[in-house]
A protein has these predicted regions:
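Interfacial/gating helices of multi-pass transporter permease domains
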Residues: 5, 63-66, 100-107, 111, ...
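Interhelical loop/hinge segments that connect adjacent transmembrane helices in multipass membrane
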Residues: 63-67, 81-122, 167-177, 297-312, ...
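Alpha-helical transmembrane segments of polytopic membrane transporters and translocases
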Residues: 75, 110, 125-127, 139-157, ...
């Protein structure tokens, strides 16, 4: 890795501590100790702030202090979870199960290159922009800022996945109906959120970045659209997890990574930086379509294809209208966003009513 001289040992310790904390958190979540998980989340946030203040403000150790603060916070979290959940009772070093270990490795090994493929989709955009275009490094800096809105979608998805994965594994009765219903609500939330964020794209960048970086808004719409299908593809990856078919996860991710590299080379030369954003969207769309097809043999889920197609068409139209700055683009984009809201309102309203009923009980 570039610019990591002298930090390799620290990075290894960071990975060890971070994964140890994640292991404890997953184990506690599997034991259905959700309140403890919530308390740990709050404490981890507080300790992260305190350690950052300690290393950066008090001790003034420089940028490496951010990494040290994260390590210290994760270590405290792991110790807290191990002690509060009494995980020592579940730790039996002498009861090694070789057969179970082989099963776990067979499932886990394809996940490593699969994750690398997702990183290729992200990093290849920057690599191609920086090297194929004139003033590529400057344009890549703008492209980096354009990920800001798409990252909001990813944060929402990560919060959802934290709660969703456990339910996906434990909910066995009526699983197909359960997955279909959750997917319908999830795609509604994703498309409504994306339509609203695309509509607010220009004012967001006017406030969020300086004047020199304002033009980054032009590349954000297609990246936001790509984030939607990245999240939907991640949802379908849960089916692979439930059925222990991680090899299919690797196959679809690899196809997306190859597609992204090819499209980047073609579209960036044709469209400029927005070619990279469009390539990202099309790559995530390919991953979603492949997963929607090959998960049919694992779990017959209702994707509501017509609704999905209309949502996509409205959002693509909104993105194109905004990027092309057509006359009265604000009005037309607002109408597209309103169409997405109207199309998905029923599912969200039903979910809200159900949550309110549970709360009253």
């Amino acid at each position: 890795l570039p610019n990591t001289e002298g930090y390799v040992a620290t990075l290894y310790f960071y990975l060890l501590i971070s994964n140890g904390r994640r292991l404890c958190a997953q184990f506690v979540r599997a034991k259905d100790m959700l309140r403890l998980v919530a308390v740990d989340g709050i404490l981890t946030s507080l300790t992260a702030v305190l350690f950052n203040v300690l290393f950066l403000v008090v001790l003034k150790v420089g940028p490496i202090g951010v990494l040290w603060a994260t390590m210290a916070s994760d270590f405290c979290s792991a110790v807290f979870l191990f002690w509060a959940a009494n995980l020592r009772r579940n730790l039996h070093l002498r009861r090694y199960d070789g057969r179970l270990m082989r099963k776990m490795l067979a499932y886990a090994l394809p996940l490593v290159p699969s994750l690398m493929c997702w990183n290729v989709i992200y990093s290849s955009d920057h690599l191609f922009v920086a090297n194929l275009l004139e003033n590529g490094k400057e344009l890549d800096g703008l492209f980096y800022y354009s990920y800001s809105i798409a990252s909001i979608m990813q944060v929402v998805a990560s919060i959802f996945n934290e709660a969703w994965q456990l339910s996906a594994v434990t909910e066995e009765e009526g699983r197909e109906r359960f997955f279909s219903r959750v997917f319908g609500i999830y795609q509604g939330v994703m498309f409504i959120g994306a339509a609203g964020l695309v509509l607010l794209c220009r004012p967001f960048f006017a406030v969020y970045v300086n004047e020199a970086s304002y033009e980054a808004w032009r590349y954000s719409p297609f990246l936001t659209l790509g984030a939607v299908y990245s999240c939907l593809g991640g949802f379908l990856n849960t089916i692979y997890m439930v059925k222990k078919r991680s090899g299919l996860s690797l196959m679809t991710s690899a196809a997306g990574a190859v597609c992204n590299c090819v499209l980047n080379f073609v579209l960036i030369l044709w469209m400029g930086v927005n070619g990279a954003a469009l390539a990202t969207f099309l790559s995530y769309l390919l991953i979603f379509v492949m997963r929607a097809v090959n998960t049919r043999g694992l779990l017959r889920m209702d994707y509501s294809p017509l609704k999905l197609a209309v949502n996509t068409a409205l959002l693509v139209t909104e993105c194109v209208l905004l990027i092309c700055e057509v006359p009265l683009w604000g009005l037309w984009c607002s109408l597209c966003a309103a169409g997405v809201l109207a199309l998905n309102f029923g599912d969200l309203y039903g979910m809200a009513r159900q949550l309110l009923r549970r709360r009253r009980r």
